[in-house]
């Protein structure tokens, strides 16, 4: 799948955002290994800590469908430069994707930053850290 199509899918997802408090809609499109695209948008709550970001929504939809292998992620928002995922989203992305997987950060003006999972969260906490602790 080409990058532009994945970004277009993230823009479609953004249209579904539930953002009555921040008025800051974000969309994500997650490309699974089998070619399926999982859409995510941010979903706010009056108890702010219950809010879910677009990236995590896309991953949770895919994982709840039994999908564990992914090829790319695109995220979009109406920001000055390409939007950047929060720390919680970076950790979830790192949980399910290899470090070299491409992540496309963009905005509505068409600016695109291509990065990788490893660059988003160097030194991510992982299952290997848990394995080490269990061995002690």
UniProtKB/Swiss-Prot annotation:
Give GO terms for biological process. cytidine deamination
Q: Which reaction does it catalyse?
A: cytidine + H2O + H(+) = uridine + NH4(+); 2'-deoxycytidine + H2O + H(+) = 2'-deoxyuridine + NH4(+)
One Gene Ontology cellular component term attached to this UniProt record is:
cytosol
Q: Where is the active site?
A: 55 (proton donor)
The signal peptide, as residue positions, is none
Q: Supply the enzyme class, top level.
A: hydrolase
Q: GO MF terms on file? A: cytidine deaminase activity; zinc ion binding
| KW Zinc (keyword) present | yes
Its required cofactor(s), as named, are:
Zn(2+)
The protein's matches in Pfam families, at most eight in alphabetical order, are given as:
dCMP_cyt_deam_1 (PF00383)
**Keyword annotations:** Hydrolase, Metal-binding, Zinc
E.C. code: 3.5.4.5
- Residues involved in Zn(2+) binding: 53, 86, 89
UniProt-annotated binding residues for substrate:
42-44
Q: Where is the CMP/dCMP-type deaminase domain?
A: 1-128
Tell me which InterPro entries the record gives: CMP_dCMP_dom (IPR002125), Cyt/Deoxycyt_deaminase (IPR050202), Cyt_deam_tetra (IPR006262), Cytidine_deaminase-like (IPR016193)
Say which family it is in: Belongs to the cytidine and deoxycytidylate deaminase family.
Q: What does this protein do?
A: This enzyme scavenges exogenous and endogenous cytidine and 2'-deoxycytidine for UMP synthesis.
Per its record, how is this protein called by name?
Answer: Cytidine deaminase
Organism field: Sporosarcina psychrophila (Bacillus psychrophilus)
Q: Which gene encodes it?
A: cdd
